[in-house]
Amino acid sequence: MEGALTARQIVNEGDSSLATELQEEPEESPGPVVDENIVSAKKQGQSTHNWSGDWSFWISSSTYKDRNEEYRQQFTHLPDSEKLIADYACALQKDILVQGRLYLSEKWLCFYSNIFRWETTISIALKNITFMTKEKTARLIPNAIQIITEGEKFFFTSFGARDRSYLIIFRLWQNVLLDKSLTRQEFWQLLQQNYGTELGLNAEEMEHLLSVEENVQPRSPGRSSVDDAGERDEKFSKAVSFTQESVSRASETEPLDGNSPKRGLGKEDSQSERNVRKSPSLASEKRISRAPSKSLDLNKNEYLSLDKSSTSDSVDEENIPEKDLQGRLYINRVFHISAERMFELLFTSSHFMQRFANSRNIIDVVSTPWTVESGGNQLRTMTYTIVLSNPLTGKYTAATEKQTLYKESREAQFYLVDSEVLTHDVPYHDYFYTLNRYCIVRSAKQRCRLRVSTDLKYRKQPWGLIKSLIEKNSWSSLESYFKKLESDLLMEESVLSQSIEDAGKHSSLRRRRRTLNRTAEPVPKLSSQRSSTDLGFEAKVDVTGKRKTVDSYDTALIVVMSIFLLLLVLLNVTLFLKLSKIEHATQSFYQLHLQGEKSLNLVSDRFSRTENIQKNKDQAHRLKGVLQDSIVMLEQLKSSLIMLQKTFDLLNKNKSGVAVES
């Protein structure tokens, strides 16, 4: 079994506040008493459901609304407080595969199938799950999840995105085991991660919904905190058999999905407790060191605790106009890099951005210096060419990036930059553009938090098929872009940390060694403080090398295509010759067949003529015999008539003689 995760994996070993959090859990809301593990299969009948739940919001997305109504109608025994968070098309493996749909809410995992009016309904309380694992269908296809409770095993397969589905189910399961309740903000973040822009909410609606204070749900009657703690310890003790190796294996499989950093599956500690509101003044010098009781970390980001020496230098994130875009949150991480250094890395012509551009096949980068606008914001424009690998588009596309540094930013403390990117040579480029928001917040002297959110903006509304094509390609490109950016920033962070450690080691040496090191120090400084002419020359060399590589690639591609076309021509000629031979053989065979038919006709004609002559002779012979017989009979008749005539003459003579005598 791959990627086995248990209930203890969500708890960090070094988290000293775990005991306090477990004692201060929000309690469950009272609801109807239902069986916590219901499995049924029945013939479908007439069922009606009265939609009268406590639904304090209205969603304009027909897709989510329809899914939620289906969920309510199919699982009427669940409490009204359970709202649909995600649904997945999958199949339940029993004696046969039962194709259906898996519904996930905050505390329940439900499956429903209807095949030829035969219903299969499964309801599993998340708190009853002992452990869950990623599995392979037929030990080959990695698209299955196995859910194990105390008495049963459920094997769900045919997931389209198994890793992403497993990650969300696992984290909600951990949330239930720790008696954590999702805040309204976390609920909406999960909803938007699973359903994306299909929710159709504008900025005002989102701000209003996120500003609603989450209701603390009371613990169900008749259940004490001691019982909860005992049940939670029992759950944990059942999962202790899994080692930390499974944790690392699961953490390695999570980034394969590419969706874990999206849409803020968990805000920072300071954000999860406060309401989203308008940006306050950035000139405030308020410094507060807080230790909030955080909810479950749904984004697997590190929330590093600051020591007392660095807390006084940090920026209070509550006083920062931080508002992510509605699209997706791709980066939310604390880097061991100062805020000023992070800004220089990302928004100047640094070696880091040059290396990053080369790795992303971005050439001909030209940028203007930062200029102050009339409103106080600073503006910078970049133009560059992107080498494309998509065969459906051209080889290159020109792009224009407009970067805006807002006036609320404070040097070395906080930077808020919006980047508007337009590509000019891709299909339907006049329909949309990309808006990226970079938020750099100082956390300590050599530490800052970087948040990058992005959204697709449309200049004119495309058709549904075109819109889905644009979003699919754009989101995949943005995801790979920011994954690479985060990876390079982590590498840069390790390099900077190593240089700081080396500097600390050098400072602790003897004075003689320190004197010798002074003479050796300017060498790396010279390499890091080269003139802009050297940088420009180096950039030109990189661009020239990139173009030579592209040209050589094009030449090789042309040669390969020419050879391929030549082979196709030779193949066509060979096929033509074979076809002509086959046609000639067919015609020859047809002519031979005609000649055979003609010869058969001649023989048959001769035979028929001979038969006719013989028949005519036989008929003539028979006719001659008949005529001869007729002549004989006529002769006999003639003789008979002559005799009769003679008899009559004799009688007449006798009568005349008698008359004379008398």
UniProtKB/Swiss-Prot annotation:
SMART domains named in the record: GRAM
Disulfide bonds: none
One GO BP annotation of this record: cellular response to cholesterol
Segments traversing the membrane: 557-577
Key words of the record: Cell membrane, Endoplasmic reticulum, Lipid transport, Lipid-binding, Membrane, Transmembrane, Transmembrane helix, Transport
Region annotation Disordered: where it falls in the sequence: 1-33, 212-294, 506-530
Subcellular location: Endoplasmic reticulum membrane; Cell membrane
Pfam families: GRAM, VASt
MF-aspect GO terms: cholesterol binding; cholesterol transfer activity
Domain of life the protein comes from: Eukaryota
Protein purpose: Cholesterol transporter that mediates non-vesicular transport of cholesterol from the plasma membrane (PM) to the endoplasmic reticulum (ER). Contains unique domains for binding cholesterol and the PM, thereby serving as a molecular bridge for the transfer of cholesterol from the PM to the ER. Plays a crucial role in cholesterol homeostasis and has the unique ability to localize to the PM based on the level of membrane cholesterol.
Protein name as catalogued: Protein Aster-C
Species, as recorded: Mus musculus (Mouse)
